[in-house]
Amino acid sequence: MINPLKKKPRTHFLQKAPEKPDWLKVKLTFPDPKNNPVAIVRNSLEKKKLNTVCESASCPNLNHCWSRKTATYMLGGDICTRRCSYCDVASGKPSALDRDEPKRVAESAIALGLKHVVITAVNRDDLEDGGAAHFAETVEVVREGLPDCKIELLVPDFKVRPESLEIIFQCKPDIFNHNVETIKRLFPEVAPQKKYERSLDVLKIASEKGFLTKSGLILGMGETVEEVKECMRDLIGVGVSLLTLGQYLQPTPTHLPVKSYVLPEVFQELRIYGKSIGFKGVFSGPLVRSSYHADEQVSWNP
């Protein structure tokens, strides 16, 4: 069920996105209905009343990922306390945390037989710890049921509160992921409640603690290639090992307008550049998202 808050205009803009080029047009395939992994994942999530960033953020890769029996669980409800101009997750006043949610995430992951679980959350600035303890509890119960499963946490910045970050560190995720999302100049327009330096600080602290760190950017929001490269150097400077680069796709006419559709050759150029400056893995392409083929990104190193 679509949250009615998603229908509220996200910005003052009212501009339909330009037609997508061929390389961004996703071809949907419909497997055998008797053995349909997409339906299996959807039924598992609906049965457990779980949210995913796949649906809440209108990800273009939903069918592809679900056909591989992978999904990114989204904790804390489906209402975010922040209002980024590009994001399709509903914004507003969230409900109280569902204390049974961690258990249901674990049950779903076990039922799907996942070997790599990605767990994220909406921003919960209304909570003292930003939802960190809820992350930790979820990791604990998933590990109990799937001891050999790799766990990747895609976390908010927690406003760089040391106590919140320490809760995350104590649960020892296999991958610590925090997306910077865009270049420094665009933060006031794209993510006005976030700060570029704050995101870098979070990643630096995690790297210094010895965690495998990962971040990502969305391109096509008005940045230049040189600004992207500058951001990549900033990320290397704070110890980030894995990077994802993908194309911004405008969810509705009231969201931040797409400024450009970045050519596949530019994504390739940025991948090569990222490898040259020290990233262990750079997953770069128009339809790449932070958790797209996340299980492969850890070892993906062409």
From Swiss-Prot:
Kinase keyword on record: no
Protein name (database record): Lipoyl synthase
Family from the record: Belongs to the radical SAM superfamily. Lipoyl synthase family.
Principal location class: cytoplasm
Main EC class the enzyme belongs to: transferase
Binding site for [4Fe-4S] cluster 1: 54, 59, 65, 291
Catalytic reactions on record: [[Fe-S] cluster scaffold protein carrying a second [4Fe-4S](2+) cluster] + N(6)-octanoyl-L-lysyl-[protein] + 2 oxidized [2Fe-2S]-[ferredoxin] + 2 S-adenosyl-L-methionine + 4 H(+) = [[Fe-S] cluster scaffold protein] + N(6)-[(R)-dihydrolipoyl]-L-lysyl-[protein] + 4 Fe(3+) + 2 hydrogen sulfide + 2 5'-deoxyadenosine + 2 L-methionine + 2 reduced [2Fe-2S]-[ferredoxin]
Keywords associated with the record: 4Fe-4S, Cytoplasm, Iron, Iron-sulfur, Metal-binding, S-adenosyl-L-methionine, Transferase
Cofactor: [4Fe-4S] cluster
Protein residues bound to [4Fe-4S] cluster 2: 80, 84, 87
Molecular function, one GO term: 4 iron, 4 sulfur cluster binding
Example of a GO cellular component annotation carried by this entry: cytoplasm
InterPro entries: Aldolase_TIM, Elp3/MiaA/NifB-like_rSAM, Lipoyl_synth, rSAM
PROSITE patterns: RADICAL_SAM
Domain called Radical SAM core: residue spans: 66-280
EC numbers: 2.8.1.8
Domain of life: Bacteria
Subcellular location: Cytoplasm
Cofactor binding: number and manner: Binds 2 [4Fe-4S] clusters per subunit. One cluster is coordinated with 3 cysteines and an exchangeable S-adenosyl-L-methionine.
